[in-house]
């Protein structure tokens, strides 16, 4: 853990009614196969929890972590984009929200989504279904460019940051006392074919980021340190 002076961890949990992400469908020129229209991909489930975590010493903030589903990104506090209350200092880190997936991000980017690596079954199913649609020859020709050709992207706009009302909660406060998941099965659809893969997320108090925030943020190889 890179912050020996850490004393307090504050988390801001954000809830969305539904996760409803679509790929950016493209036509791609493939050697030996001509121009191929790639199948669209749709990922969706009910209920979506994301979190921003701020670690502080006795006198200053130290780092910020954006959950971005299962594989987030943390930065030293000085590396976060900060905004101010009217007439105040810049002390509030900004979280940009990706369209559809609601992945919370430290910058307004268009990039490969981190949830893509959350469950190996997702990538396996998608690649198998894509091969069934465009054929093994086209898959081999695309090689490492396949995911880019499929338009698997999170897209976060660069609008003006907004503040929202906060409610102070702990593990004994509703809705953190709900002992279950926040919806039904998660589905992945590739073209006309779909499959249930996984479930909607559980209440934050049942998630590793709440129960063991430092181990989750700094001990998980899938999470990354930004600038």
What does each model-identified segment do?
Residues 3-11, 17-227:
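Domain-length functional cores that host ligand/cofactor binding and catalytic or interaction surfaces
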């Amino acid at each position: 853990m890179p912050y020996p002076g850490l004393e307090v961890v504050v988390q801001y949990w954000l809830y969305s009614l539904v996760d409803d992400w679509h790929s950016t469908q493209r036509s791609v020129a493939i050697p030996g196969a001509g121009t191929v229209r790639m199948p669209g991909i749709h990922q969706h489930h009910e209920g979506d929890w994301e979190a921003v975590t701020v670690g502080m010493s006795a006198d200053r903030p130290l780092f910020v972590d954006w959950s971005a589903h299962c594989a987030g990104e943390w930065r030293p506090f000085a590396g976060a984009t900060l905004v101010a209350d009217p007439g105040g200092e810049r002390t509030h880190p900004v979280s940009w929200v990706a369209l559809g997936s609601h992945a919370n991000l430290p910058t307004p980017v268009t990039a490969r989504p981190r949830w893509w690596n959350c469950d190996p079954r997702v990538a396996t199913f998608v690649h198998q279904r894509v091969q069934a649609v465009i054929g093994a020859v086209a898959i081999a020709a695309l090689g490492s460019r396949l995911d880019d050709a499929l338009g698997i992207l999170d897209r976060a706009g660069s609008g003006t940051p907004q503040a929202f009302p906060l409610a102070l909660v702990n593990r004994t406060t509703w809705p953190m006392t709900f002992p279950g998941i926040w919806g039904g099965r998660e589905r992945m659809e590739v073209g006309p074919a779909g499959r249930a893969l996984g479930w909607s997320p559980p209440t934050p108090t049942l998630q590793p980021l709440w129960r063991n925030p430092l181990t989750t943020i700094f001990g998980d190889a899938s999470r990354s340190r930004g600038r």
